[in-house]
Every structure is written in C-alpha cells, then in structure tokens.
Amino acid sequence: MVVETIIIIVIWVILLIISINSLYQINKKNKSRISFKESMDLTELPVITFINNNVKLNFLLDTGSNNSFINKSILNMLDYKELNGASNIIGFEGNKIKNSICEMKIEYKDYIFDTTFNIADLDASFNVIKQEDGVQLHGILGSLFFQKYKYVLDFQSLIAYMK
C-alpha cells in the first residue's frame, strides 16, 4: 500500500513538473511575439519599433535583404560601437557599395537584441517612404537578424515569433 501511494505521488509530481514546464514555454513564446499588425494596417509595411538609448527606432522588416541597416543620420542619438572593417553590399543595379558597420543593442519589451548593422545614408529613401506612407524609418532588419534570433514572420497573423 505504501509503495503504491509513493508511485502515485511520484507520477503526480512528474505530471506537475511537465505542466509547469509547458506553461513556461507557452508564456515564453507569447512574450517573444512581436506584432506588426498596426503598421501593416496603417502603412502596409511591416515595421517594428525598438528602443536604443531611450530613442524609439522604426525598423522595416526585409527578408529580401541579408544585412541589417541603420540610417547614418540617427547615429548621434544612439548607443553603438563602430566596428573595424567594412561591408560590401551589392545594390539593385549591381553596384558595389562599401559601408561601415556597427554593433548595437536594440530592445523590444524584455528582449535585448545585439545586432550588427551596416551604416548607410538612407535619408533620401526613408524620406520618400515618410511622404508616401507616413512612417519615419530609422533602419532595416534583414534576414540574418531573423536567422540569428530564430524569428519567423507570419504574414497571416502579422506577427514575428521566436521558433
């Protein structure tokens, strides 16, 4: 009788641990979700707002770009570390562009993302987007960001979530 009671208690403890772990995983997954629904509703562009140095930064989500970019004109307000070397980018017309690179932490809710950015003068492009769509962009997050942090873009639900 005592052995059977101990076995039942052990089974209940195991089930309790499994349940707690499952709830933790669900909560973690829900906290890591980043919605871009509002920006899609307003501008039809997938944009997410992050924070660096108490400055709100709007990033366009661009899976067609490998690299991430930060606009050179905003850097004086940000906390970043310029890295040695440069990155060679191939533009739409096939032209090679040499960019400086920096490392910068960007925050979303409780998450901090340490990311490498190409520094580029994006004022002309971003001004056109601001005039046409009404959103001020500060940078672009490319596919290497999504790969590094295991984020998937779900355009049906209009969220990015950690896999």
State each model region's role.
Residues 1-163:
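Pepsin/retropepsin-fold aspartyl endopeptidases
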